[in-house]
Amino acid sequence: MRVAMLSILFCGVTGSAIDQSWSELIASMEKMHVAMASVAPTGRSDVDFVRLMIPHHQAAIDMAKTQLLYGKDPQMRRLAQEIITDQQSEIELMNLWLKQHKLEH
């Protein structure tokens, strides 16, 4: 239901007019929101930042993968690939930081 509402709000279309790529992009956002909402605040800005950024970056990766599946524009496809590469690297860096500080994701 929430995905359908977001679709209506953001593009003014209903049900059958929503294509597969749009549905997958919205699903990536929904997954991110659930993951971010499950992060308990610690009161430590660095920790909270990293724990929230990891699902945010993962959503960017998931959306970029959707772009590679459905997108046609070469410039947007290159951008999607760069996003995947950069965001994966940054997730690894953040996970390493959490590990070095003996914190969990």
What are these regions, as identified by a protein language model?
Residues R2-M5, C11-H105:
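His/Met- and acidic-residue-enriched segments that coordinate or traffic transition-metal cofactors
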